[in-house]
A protein has these predicted regions:
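Extended, charged alpha/beta regions that create polyanion-binding interfaces
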Residues: 1-16
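A broad, low-specificity signal marking well-ordered, structured residues that form hydrophobic/aromatic
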Residues: 2, 34, 122-125, 206, ...
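Active-site-adjacent mobile loop/cap segments within catalytic or ligand-binding domains
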Residues: 4, 115, 166-268, 281
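Catalytic-core regions of hydrolytic enzymes
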Residues: 12-162, 171-183, 187, 230, ...
Length: 282
């Protein structure tokens, strides 16, 4: 088996004591970054309501903006939007935006639709194992031409075996984080309305495929259901939805704050232990 010890800014041992100067950001801890993805946009309206003809792209953007306002008011938290207007952003571009901002969590907001107007309830999705496997194959196939980092490590100068191990390690941790965050959001969603799925569901949605960012996709309700369309079109309910999403997101970061963040320092103190991962055969 292979044991990797990952340390947060550990220097080489020396015989002489040395003075370490930390930046102000290091001393106070960085913000956790949440990438909020408003589904669809521009020429892609998403689902359209049966009665009010509400467009999914407008509902998702409104909820995303409200959620960002809530997050940005919290000490140690910051949100970025993958789109902040009525324009289309490609699915992989959405992932790229999140990675460029070093996001700690990716939340994609949608409104569901079905041919039957009786379908109802919210759902929360994370990436399926099959989807993760296909994405891993894509990353490994393209690693020679990629300068992207996975979990802070470049794959382009690693041999195939080591690159595969590092990618698998990153994906395993990411999927665990995705499920943990999604479960907390799913629980909060159940407190404000009916749910289409009794538990977090798994699917191969493209926007969930970042190998190093915990990600979830939230279906806020069925826009094809007249009753839920009416609620989703209401500014009051959109605010309620944003508040609910924040509660789940905040619960996740309070329970599992990333190392080096202000939330982690408040919880554990400045001295944080390394994280140890054990890779077992098979």
């Amino acid at each position: 088996r292979l044991v990797l010890d990952l340390y947060d800014q550990v220097g080489k041992a020396t015989d002489e004591p040395r003075v370490v100067k930390h930046s102000q950001e290091t001393r106070k801890g960085r913000d956790v970054v949440i990438a909020i993805d408003a589904g669809h946009g521009g020429d892609d309206p998403g689902a359209i309501g049966r009665k009010l003809k509400s467009k999914e792209k407008h509902i998702t953007l409104s909820i995303a903006r409200k959620l960002k306002k809530i997050i940005d008011k919290q000490p140690g938290m910051r949100a970025i939007l993958t789109r902040d207007g009525d324009y289309y952003v490609g699915l992989r571009k959405r992932m790229k935006i999140a990675r460029q901002h070093h996001a700690d969590l990716f939340v994609s907001i949608h409104a569901d639709a079905f041919r039957s107007p009786k379908a109802h309830g919210s759902s929360v999705f994370v990436l399926s194992r099959r989807g993760a496997s296909s994405e891993a194959a894509r990353w490994l196939a393209a690693k020679e031409n990629a300068a992207d980092l996975v979990g802070g490590v470049s794959l382009d100068d690693k041999d195939d075996v080591l690159a595969s191990v590092l990618l698998d390690l990153s994906q395993t941790g990411t999927q665990a984080g995705s499920m943990s965050a999604a479960a907390k959001v799913h629980r909060e969603m159940g407190r404000i309305g009916r749910q289409h799925g009794k538990k977090v569901q798994q699917a191969g949605f493209m926007v969930l495929k970042s190998p190093d960012i915990p990600s979830m996709l939230v279906e806020t309700g069925f826009i094809s259901n007249p009753g839920e369309e009416r609620k989703l079109s209401s500014r009051k309910y959109q605010q309620k939805m944003a508040d609910t999403l924040f509660k789940g997101i905040n619960a996740y970061f309070q329970a599992e704050p990333p190392v080096g963040t202000l939330i982690a320092m408040k919880k554990h103190g400045p001295g944080q232990k390394s994280a140890k991962y054990v890779i077992k055969p098979g």
